[in-house]
Structures are given as structure tokens and as C-alpha cells.
């Protein structure tokens, strides 16, 4: 179905892979195969073809949006008679555990930083804004990591609010997947980037998702463009289990790893453990808190096998 023939009853324009790839226009490939190999996640096949057909058109679209935003800022400055500072453009990336949000974020960071209009692109994950393990243990929330109540939302909202307010240096806490905790005194300083990519489970959530912690503004209020990375639930579970098995042979073997004991599991035990963790924690969080936010996104990327994007929906 062509773009013109699509229903007016949906807020999204829908593109199959070939339709979306055609929108690349003449945007050059700026990444080498070696650079792409460094960007992909532990359990993903990221190819030059995927970058060319999916991410280059997306970077072109984002460059249009960012340029439009800069013109809007210039109009406001002209109206006010001021010469204000440049305010970061914020892109959020949401989706399930194991869907490949981090890879999407890293690829976009690499591509967007090569556009001459916006060289400084920072990437922050919301994992750093989880409450420390000590707090989660005190509140009985260790098995609820990633659920709304496990985040220090006041700190996260203040972080993005300060960035949008033009604060010169803003700090973000850093999370370690090795120790499964926020790194004490490990804050990262973000100094007025042109673009901030904010990646996490909760970046599309709003105040209604936090009835236990009411506040009037939320992360999504400060986001300029939002992306939801989607995939069928059966694929998500498979990817989660496969990732767990690779961690079992890799990161979990480190004696300092919080999950070091999992390295001693047999393959069958590891598969069963991962399946249980998926069902009891990650699937539950997906159904209750993440998937309901999908239609709030500016753009939805739907993946099929091998993490290949097969469909893109763009909000009109």
C-alpha cells in the first residue's frame, strides 16, 4: 500500500522495509564494517545492509527534525531579541529487555555525530537512575528492577529538565551490569551536547504510570523525538534466553559479576533459569509497563528474526 492510500484513521504512516530503505535518498554510508561490529550487541546480527536500509533513512529524518527545531529556536530568539544558547535535542529509545535498544542507540549516536550540524551526541541509559541495590533491598524491590517503582524518577526528571533549561554541566549516575548496581560516585558529566539520546525501558512512561510517586512533569515531557523498538513476544523471549546463555559463558564467568553463580549452571539449567526470569520479571514488566507505552512513540521499529527491522511506523 502506498503512503497516499493509507488510512486516515491511524496516527501512523506505515512502511515496509523496502519503502523505508528508499527514503535514504543520497545519505552516504559513514560507518565501516569494523565500526558496525563494535556497535552491535552481544546477541545481534548488525550488518551494513541493516544500517543502510534502516538507520540511514532514520538519521536523515532525524536531521530534518533537528534542523527544524533549530530554526524554531532561531525564530524565538529573533522574537525575544536574544542570542540564546543552543538547547539539546532529546531522542528517547524505549522497548523491552533484549530487543536491542542499546544497539539502536549506539548506531544512531555514531551516525548523527557524523552530520556537520550536530557533532556532539551524548548517550545516557536510564539504568543509572535505578535506586541503588541497598535501597531496593530495603523496599523489597530487588525482583522489580526495571519496574516503575525501582527508579529515582525525581532525579531522572531533574536531569532532563536541567539539560533542557541550558544548565552547562549536568551529571548522570552510571550503572554497572557487572556488579548489577549503580556505581557509587561514578557520575558522568553531560556538558550541553547538540543531541542527547536517552535509552531505557521507561522513557515513554508518563505520570499515570507512577501512581505511587505522583509528580506533574515526566521524562516524556522533555523528549523531542521518541522511538519504540518492537518485536513479537516469542522472539523477545528467545533473544533474552540466548543472551543469558552468552553471558553465562562470558560476563558471568568474572568472579566480580553479581551473577557469577549462573556461570556454573549446565546449559539446561541456564535455559530454565533464563525462561523463569523472563516470565516472572521481564515479561511481566513488558506487559504491564512497557508495551502500553508503545503508541506514544514518534516512531515504532518492528523487528523480525535476526533483529532485522521489517516495518517502520512514523507518527503523522
Curated annotation (Swiss-Prot):
E.C. no: 2.7.1.33
One matching Pfam family: PRK
Entry's family note: Belongs to the prokaryotic pantothenate kinase family.
Protein's UniProt name: Pantothenate kinase
Upper taxonomic lineage: Bacteria, Pseudomonadati, Pseudomonadota, Gammaproteobacteria, Enterobacterales
Gene Ontology CC: cytoplasm
Keyword GTP-binding among record annotations: no
InterPro entries: P-loop_NTPase, PanK, PRK/URK
Catalytic reaction(s) noted: (R)-pantothenate + ATP = (R)-4'-phosphopantothenate + ADP + H(+)
GO BP terms in the entry: coenzyme A biosynthetic process
Enzyme class: transferase
Single annotated GO MF: ATP binding
UniProt binding sites for ATP: 95-102
Compartments reported by the entry: Cytoplasm
UniProt keyword terms in alphabetical order: ATP-binding, Coenzyme A biosynthesis, Cytoplasm, Kinase, Nucleotide-binding, Transferase
Pathway(s) this gene product operates in, as recorded in its UniProt entry: Cofactor biosynthesis; coenzyme A biosynthesis; CoA from (R)-pantothenate: step 1/5
NCBIfam families the record matches: panK_bact (TIGR00554)
Encoding gene (name): coaA
